[in-house]
Amino acid sequence: MEIVHVPVMVKEVLSYFSNLRGVFLDCTVGAGGHSEAILENIKGSVVIGIDVDEEILSVAKQRLKKYESEGRAKLLKATYVEAQRVLSQLGVKAVNGIIMDLGVSTLQLMKGERGFAFSSDGPLDMRMDKTQRLTAYDIVNFWQENQLRRIFFEYGEEKRYAGRIARFIVKNRPVETTAKLVEVIARALPEKERRFRRRHFATRVFQAIRIAVNNELENLRNFLVQVPDILNQNGRIIVISFHSLEDRIVKEAFRSIQELDVLTRKPVRPSLEEVRENPKARSAKMRIAERK
């Protein structure tokens, strides 16, 4: 598979990691962009990269094979909630840097059969981990209307039309493909909502379903409480998020965990130049904390 994924805010990541050495944990290695930058620019660095998506992990393995052969990179299939177990298995007690990029990879979005994108037709899947049972199809076709309304409201921040969209989905079952789901959402929304929203009108619903399928918010909370146990003193954690729900969780966790010093009162945003070159970076927010 051709590598087209461009990692976001690489310069900022390297800047905040510049004084660190030793072992780094890439919790969402994806296509390997941030890991590659760390290995290339931080002398003597070693990266442990984990990702729950085997397909994209194979891309990272290809990209980082030189470093794997040198013993400077170790890539494993795991979710970041399992980070402590993974490090223990590798004989690593703690690391000096942690990077998390919570965005969906371009490679995942490009493959219609993964079901993440509303821009290309495919089955309703949306699983990061293809071995798990719950899919987007299950949620769309079998969850009760009030359950759908709740996730659209809470996870998609679809404040005004969550109930109406849920009602239309239930009424039009079975909904088997991403294209059919987009069609149903379109019918549920007034024309002005479809035409004048800043982002595509299906964005919020797709986000909500993806978060529910992969238990993303709960996993993030469960990981962040582990950070003091796996980060060395003066080590740093960088989290890049792409919507307000994730950013709020990171902000509150960094503030509430006593062992962390927050280095960013407000989130760091990508430069205008980066956004021009890589529009995916537009909504990125980076927060950094340091282990006391």
From Swiss-Prot:
UniProt catalytic activity: cytidine(1402) in 16S rRNA + S-adenosyl-L-methionine = N(4)-methylcytidine(1402) in 16S rRNA + S-adenosyl-L-homocysteine + H(+)
Record Pfam families: Methyltransf_5
Chain sites annotated for binding S-adenosyl-L-methionine: G32, G33, H34, D51, L87, D101, Q108
Keywords carried by this UniProt record: Cytoplasm, Methyltransferase, rRNA processing, S-adenosyl-L-methionine, Transferase
Record flagged with keyword Ribosomal protein: no
Single Gene Ontology MF annotation: rRNA (cytosine-N4-)-methyltransferase activity
Superkingdom to which the source organism belongs: Bacteria
Location, primary (coarse class): cytoplasm
First-level EC class: transferase
GO BP terms: rRNA base methylation
Signal peptide feature range: none
Membrane-spanning segments: none
Family the UniProt entry places it in: Belongs to the methyltransferase superfamily. RsmH family.
Function: Specifically methylates the N4 position of cytidine in position 1402 (C1402) of 16S rRNA.
Protein name per Swiss-Prot or TrEMBL: Ribosomal RNA small subunit methyltransferase H
Native species: Pseudothermotoga lettingae (strain ATCC BAA-301 / DSM 14385 / NBRC 107922 / TMO) (Thermotoga lettingae)
Lineage of the species this protein comes from: Bacteria, Thermotogati, Thermotogota, Thermotogae, Thermotogales
Recorded name of the encoding gene: rsmH
